[in-house]
Amino acid sequence: MPNHHTLLSSSLFPVGSNISTWWNFGSMLLTCTALQISTGFFLAVHYTANINLAFSSIIHITRDVPYGWIMQNLHAIGASLFFLCIYIHIARGLYYGLYMNKGVWLSGTTLLIILMATAFFGYVLPWGQMSFWAATVITNLLTAVPYLGNSLTTWLWGGFSINDPTLTRFFALHFILPFLITSLSSIHIILLHNEGSNNPLGTNSDIDKVPIHPYHSYKDMFMISSMITLLFIVLSFMPDLLNDPENFSKANPMTTPQHIKPEWYFLFAYSILRSIPNKLGGTLALLMSVIILTTTPFTHTSYIRPMTFRPLTQALFWTLIATFITITWTATKQVEPPFTLISQVASVTYFSFFIINPIFGWAENKTMMNN
């Protein structure tokens, strides 16, 4: 094997030789983080956090700043790509039982929550019509908190309605949180290196390890290159593919959009929120849709770690994926039959996975013991 740079070699740990492409999404997420922070910095240089100037400053960036349209679209499309990668990353973790490494899984779930908060704050910044109303609807959920709700909402808004102080603090939070994400990502990786990566078979990799470089690093580079290629294809030919047409209009508190909805990556949680006709119940369900991921390390009952050799649980997993897509789709529709019923059934099915999965694990154990 050729000699490599000492610093590079010492920082790259040996891993199992059989890890698949599903293990590449960690490095892709790291690339997305670097891309978002770098493009975000250049956008922040030209952005003005003022309700009268924010929308105009976005137009200024797109039209007047050299390559500003590239920065703005890279940042917007990059956010969608970030969430696509993180959802695949989480699905891989659920399928292969990576949640059994509790420190890594819980730090990852914390990262997801902070990432969702960061993306929400960022969505408000252009001060378009959908940005304003999405912020109004979501921040209003704080009023569902007993006793403290109204005080918390006023504190978050910086007044009695969403106004200039709200935009200023959202910009400050959107700027600072990515650095917290970077720090937590470092902790996430350090915790992972305590035990090392799992593999598709769920077996101990100690007997068959290879250096990350060059074997797995080239695979990482290929997937990162593919991701960046996809990013630039969308940027060049379909830059507004994931934008809401309502957001091309400046925020107007006097006019409500016909259908208020957040970005696609929040639609699953938003659909769960809408499916419950009670404000407090919907808010709790919204929070639980993400927090419930933290329960998986404590409810795993099967003797076998991954789902690779568990056909019953595999069927349950793919039902969860289909449910996730269905919930996302229903959130794009109006709150009317049959979409209300579909989202309610899909929401129950989504949460059922986390209840039925341990039961299936227990049933599989019984079957194995009998055989």
From Swiss-Prot:
Q: Which residues cross the membrane?
A: 25-45, 69-90, 105-125, 170-190, 218-238, 280-300, 312-332, 339-358
- InterPro entries from the UniProt entry: Cyt_b/b6_C, Cyt_b/b6_C_sf, Cyt_b/b6_N, Cytb/b6-like_sf, Cytochrome_b, Cytochrome_b_C_euk/bac, Cytochrome_b_N_euk/bac, Di-haem_cyt_TM
Subcellular location(s) per record: Mitochondrion inner membrane
Keywords from UniProt, A to Z, are:
Electron transport, Heme, Iron, Membrane, Metal-binding, Mitochondrion, Mitochondrion inner membrane, Respiratory chain, Transmembrane, Transmembrane helix, Transport, Ubiquinone
Q: Name one GO cellular component term.
A: mitochondrial inner membrane
Specify whether Manganese is a keyword of the entry.
Answer: no
The UniProt GO MF terms for this protein read:
metal ion binding; ubiquinol-cytochrome-c reductase activity
Annotated residues for binding of heme b b566:
89, 188
The cross-references to Pfam families, in alphabetical order and at most eight, read:
Cytochrom_B_C, Cytochrome_B
Taxonomically, the superkingdom here is: Eukaryota
What does the similarity note say? Belongs to the cytochrome b family.
- What is this protein's function per UniProt? Component of the ubiquinol-cytochrome c reductase complex (complex III or cytochrome b-c1 complex) that is part of the mitochondrial respiratory chain. The b-c1 complex mediates electron transfer from ubiquinol to cytochrome c. Contributes to the generation of a proton gradient across the mitochondrial membrane that is then used for ATP synthesis.
In the UniProt entry for this protein, what further remark is given in the free-text comments? Heme 1 (or BL or b562) is low-potential and absorbs at about 562 nm, and heme 2 (or BH or b566) is high-potential and absorbs at about 566 nm.
Q: What protein am I looking at?
A: Cytochrome b
Q: Which organism is it from?
A: Toxicocalamus preussi
Q: What is the primary gene name for this protein?
A: MT-CYB
